[in-house]
């Protein structure tokens, strides 16, 4: 009797092991089915970089418009946004959740160099296309990543062009830079130095700051004592606010010049208490009140579909960064696959909507080096200083 009980227990145990072995972790969906295509984006909806969070919400407007118009080849876009608080560790967590639980087909946007670098290799390893990172680190595209397609002009290119404008148009020779101590700021620093070298000039001050710093008194004093006539800012919105307010308190009034990352004038004007007036920035797209037919279309759609959102640079940047994936999906047709989308993306040439012209090939995934230059006028108005301008020193185009 005891032998039979032991045999029964053994049989049950073996059966249980076999059952567990057959219940392998479910593979994530392929990213699409007959009715939908799943696309994701991370972005800071909270935290020090929250003003940049509207980028991800702007992409949602684009996909809402696409779905309203019938979708793409019979499929609608199902879009997922996750808040990573501009924290690379959080980015890793939310991206893995989207890939492994939701089954994302592709990512668009994604604010920040450090957050993007934290997931770049993971996305490539999982063969997931990533279009239009909302960052411009040269390490995103050099060496080439077959799954990553950049829309944003490199920080190095932008800083190069802005420095040229300072020297040649503003006729200023004493230039300083306050930069975030990560890839975002360091790439810009390289671009500034590269351009200054052509004039046999050097920076009078180069000051790194950490993304989480809240006191810039010593840094501002160093800038003031350097005699800088113009200061480039490659920092996050919170740091920019603190810098300008601290500078105003000590009577330091250089010509501030900043990245397109701080080109949402109504926002920056408001949070600086009006101190943003007169600041010059790069711009990756047209002014928000542009009469460009597509800008008018999306601006009207925003009023109708997302009245709670403020139409501005960061918000429409989400459209600009995500639009190429829509174009590629249209080209592919009904027979959707990752390989087909990659082929379509690699064939995009001189494609332009509300931003610069984009061209990608199998050997080059940096889409552009062009930007506009604008100035914040009274009451946060936009003053166009320079149309599309490319970096004549860009080395990536020569490869």
Where are these regions (language model features)?
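Short, low-complexity disordered leader/linker segments with a strong preference
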Residues: 1-38, 395-399
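Extracytoplasmic "Venus flytrap"
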Residues: 29-35, 40-60, 82-89, 111-112, ...
